[in-house]
Structure formats: structure tokens, C-alpha cells
């Protein structure tokens, strides 16, 4: 069995999608029309460093991931058994599963990016060396009540999210802990997957009412629940994803329990491939 995984914010880089925009000219033109700017120029030239601003990052990654997927299935003539995406990448997983078309997905991520960009002064940091329980305990002990766990990327790679000054304070405290191997501030423009996204979630929920989705043709593993999407709760799950933790470790563990599973990352970079390698390694090391 094979699962295709789609990356989210943090995987963007100048030059991504090179070659794809000309190959899929019709969809590229469609994207330009929806966005009101050239997606090719944004990805290849990165004017005003816009690629690192969430309102641009999200549509850019969605388009590049989608075109990468279309090229892959056209060239290889194979469809995956399962799909999953990290945060923004989940929209590409739903697109691959034919829950909505390219255009609908782009309209959704454009709105998602716009709403998330309105909430400023946030930050995120990855804490390496501690598991989710240990990070939660440390946040409590250090009275960092305004910091949330945003992503469980691997058993010992936990991302925290909150106001910029609180994240800086948290990072300094985590660095003093002997078990912590590294604290890495993330190059993001907001406190994603935290309570600070509640307003964005509410507005996005309203926006979703206008759209029609189809039942997924391939199981899509949800970040929020680490199990397949159900059609009835699709819109609710997408809205919840904005202010809930990304359960990436649990999602990959769920897929690994299905039997012999191969994973292929579709889109720019290999961040998810590295995380999956870590999850597998830690699963092997854990006592049964």
C-alpha cells in the first residue's frame, strides 16, 4: 500500500514549481485569475519576500502541491491507497481524493491564508528531545499558560505556538532543560494551530457554508483526529484544523498499522519524509 503526503507551510522555497506552471498552463491561468496575481512569478521570483507571508504561502504551496500530484499520477498512472497532508497540505490530500476541484481548493486556502494573516504578533518554535507529555508538563510548571502545543510532528519533535514574546520566553526556558536537544524558532508569520486562531476558525467556518464537497474517493487522514475524514463532518473538521493541534505522529502511526505502508512526499522539499523516518525509527525503538 502507498500513502501520498503533502507538505505544509515551512516547505515553501523560491523556485518551487519550476516547469509545472508551463506544463499545466490552464490551471496556472485559473490560479492567476482567482488570486489576482501571477502564481508563477510569486514562486519563481518571490517578490517582496511574499512567499513567507501566510496569505501568499498557502495558495503557493497548494498550487505547487496540486500540480505536482497531477503530474505524478499522469506520469506514473498510479493512484495512492491513502492520502494525508500536514496542515495546509491537507487541502491537497482532499483535492487528490476528489472531495473538491482545483479551483474550490484554491478559493478555500486563499481565504484561510487571508484570515490567518490578520492575527499578527504570533510565533512558533519546535522543541526537540521532549515528547508531548513532557512539553505539556513543562509549560504548566513554567506557568506558560498562554502557549499551546500546535504540532506533534514526531514523538520527540513538538511545536509550540503563541504570542511572539511568550514563545521567546518559552524557548529560553526549554533551552535550559537537559533533555532538550534543540529549540528552533519557526519561520512563520503567526501563532498557527493555537487558541489565537479562534477568530479565524469562526470566520472560516462561515465561509465554508457556501461550498459543496464530494465524499472522498480515497481515505484522507485528518490532522485533528488522526483518522479518516467522514463526509458529514468534513467542513467542521477543516474549520477545527485551524485552531487544533496537528497530530502528525498519530496520523502516520495509524497508517503504519494498516500493514506494509510506503510513503511518498508530493510537493516541494522533503520535510515530511524526514518526520516519517523519525516516527518509524522511534516506533521501532519503543518497547512492545
Curated annotation (Swiss-Prot):
It is found in: Cytoplasm. It comes from the Bacteria. Pathway: Antibiotic biosynthesis; bacillaene biosynthesis. Transmembrane segments: none annotated. It is an enzyme of class 2 (transferase). Keywords: Acyltransferase, Antibiotic biosynthesis, Cytoplasm, Transferase. The active site is at residues 87, 193. It catalyses: holo-[ACP] + malonyl-CoA = malonyl-[ACP] + CoA. Belongs to the FabD family. GO terms for biological process: antibiotic biosynthetic process; fatty acid biosynthetic process. PANTHER family: MALONYL-COA-ACYL CARRIER PROTEIN TRANSACYLASE, MITOCHONDRIAL (PTHR42681:SF1). GO terms for molecular function: [acyl-carrier-protein] S-malonyltransferase activity. Involved in some intermediate steps for the synthesis of the antibiotic polyketide bacillaene which is involved in secondary metabolism. It catalyzes the transfer of the malonyl-CoA group to the acyl-carrier-protein AcpK (Mal-AcpK). The keyword Acyltransferase applies. The keyword Acyltransferase applies. Its EC number is 2.3.1.39. GO terms for cellular component: cytosol. The lineage of its organism: Bacteria, Bacillati, Bacillota, Bacilli, Bacillales. This is Polyketide biosynthesis malonyl CoA-acyl carrier protein transacylase PksC.
Amino acid at each position: 500500500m502507498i500513502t501520498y503526503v503533502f507538505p505544509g507551510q515551512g516547505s515553501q522555497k523560491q523556485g518551487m514549481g519550476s516547469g509545472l506552471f508551463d506544463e499545466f498552463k490552464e490551471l496556472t491561468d485559473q490560479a492567476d485569475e482567482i488570486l489576482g496575481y501571477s502564481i508563477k512569478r510569486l514562486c519563481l521570483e518571490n517578490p517582496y519576500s511574499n512567499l513567507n507571508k501566510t496569505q501568499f504561502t498557502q495558495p503557493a504551496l497548494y498550487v505547487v502541491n496540486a500540480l505536482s500530484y497531477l503530474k505524478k499520477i499522469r506520469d506514473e498512472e498510479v493512484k495512492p491507497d491513502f492520502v494525508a497532508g500536514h496542515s495546509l497540505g491537507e487541502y491537497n490530500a482532499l483535492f487528490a481524493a476528489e472531495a473538491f476541484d482545483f479551483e474550490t481548493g484554491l478559493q478555500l486556502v486563499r481565504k484561510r491564508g487571508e484570515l490567518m494573516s490578520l492575527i499578527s504578533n504570533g510565533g512558533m518554535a519546535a522543541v526537540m528531545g521532549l515528547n508531548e507529555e513532557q512539553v505539556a508538563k513543562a509549560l504548566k510548571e513554567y506557568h506558560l499558560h498562554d502557549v499551546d502545543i500546535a504540532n506533534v510532528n514526531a514523538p520527540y519533535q513538538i511545536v509550540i505556538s503563541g504570542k511572539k514574546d511568550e514563545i521567546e520566553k518559552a524557548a529560553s526556558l526549554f533551552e535550559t532543560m537537559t533533555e532538550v536537544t534543540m529549540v528552533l524558532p519557526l519561520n512563520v508569520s503567526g501563532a498557527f494551530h493555537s487558541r489565537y486562531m479562534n477568530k479565524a476558525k469562526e470566520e472560516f467556518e462561515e465561509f465554508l457554508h457556501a461550498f459543496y464537497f464530494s465524499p472522498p474517493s480515497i481515505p484522507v487522514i485528518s490532522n485533528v483526529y488522526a483518522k479518516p475524514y467522514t463526509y458529514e463532518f468534513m467542513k467542521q473538521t477543516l474549520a477545527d484544523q485551524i485552531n487544533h493541534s496537528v497530530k502528525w505522529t498519530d496520523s502516520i502511526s495509524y497508517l503504519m498499522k494498516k500493514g506494509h505502508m510506503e510513503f511518498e512526499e508530493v510537493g516541494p522539499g522533503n520535510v515530511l519524509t524526514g518526520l516519517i523516518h523519525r516516527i518509524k525509527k522511534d516506533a521501532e525503538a519503543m518497547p512492545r
